[in-house]
Amino acid sequence: MTDDYAAIITRVVPSTRPLPGPLAGRTLLVKDLIDVVGVRTTYGSRIYADHVPTRTAPAVQRLLDAGAVLVGKANLPEFAWNVTGQNPWYGTAVNPLHPGRTTGGSSSGNAAALAADLCDLGLGTDTGCSIRLPSACCGTVGLKPSWGSVSIEGVFPLVPTLDTVGPMARSVADVALMWSVLTDKPAPAPRLAGRTVGLLTRPPTVGDGSAPPESLAAEEWIGSLEDLGARVVPATIPEPEANTWPLFFHEAARSHAATFPARADEYSDNVRTKLELAQKVDPGEVAAAYRALERWRRYEPDVDLYVSPCIGIDLPPEDCDELEVRVAFSAFLRPFNLLGWAGLAIGNLQLVAPRDEVVLAAGLALESG
């Protein structure tokens, strides 16, 4: 591995003989937020610098049992709570596709490694954007599965109501194969014919009153979608009736209760600032956020799936202030974690639907042409 890519992989694991199976011999990089027995797993933090898990996360075990070969753990920002991939403790993964620009976060090491051809497959996590955003930044493919479809056991929690584990690769076909292994379901056949696709040029907010960016970037895909038999229509998605950020901060504070504020000095300034804010969230606002989310998740779309860009702003530089760009940078992605829907990133294209099979079928159709 060259020095340029040294911060992508936090540690290399000696190769083992692969088991037979659909992933036989495919090299796998696991985000360092996910436990692997006997392999130091830091969660991107200084606090857990010497942590060695005594169990392997079920999602990882499924991939290994299918023949994947674990070759290392992928770098990430501290506790996966950063959308630009910056990590003051272990270095920041570079973007092989756009040098000098952010890799996105928080599954930054996975996406960068895939873009640099350092592995075949990646296993990441996504709470607000963290598989799809790095995939878009690095020109790779990543699936945020619908909430609950893949086990999150053995993963350090951020916001359990939103946390997901999902596959990353360089092709939709490989992502679909990994998804099949992770869920024990057959991968869907390619399909766009007869589907109604809603074109999103502005995402819904998460109820916080912000003005999300407008982007026409996904319009370049209209011709391809229509050529494959889809009907593309303008679309919008209603917004939750209350601000949902208090829910996010409330659960994040709970996830860190064992170490914050007791060990606050061992956190980076970035995450410490967020956790200090989380301590001040009003309980009434938290309750209102849960009620709003419950009602919002009942929304039934009037299209089969949506298409949007993953990123609605220019790609920030790698040394940007994460706190300044995080809301606009992830605006097209975060709402779908709250809704619990599946989101597939193919470079900067995002396909979204309530069901994993629908976005995978559409992505496979686009990939096969």
Descriptions of predicted regions:
Residues 1-52, 56-57, 77-82, 315:
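Short, well-ordered alpha-helical
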Residues 2-4, 65, 115-203, 219-224, ...:
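Structural helix-boundary/capping segments
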Residues 26-43, 247-292, 344-348:
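Short helix-loop capping/hinge segments that flank enzyme active sites or metal/cofactor-binding pockets
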Residues 46-54, 91-106:
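Short pre-catalytic strand/loop immediately N-terminal to key active-site residues, enriched for Gly-Thr
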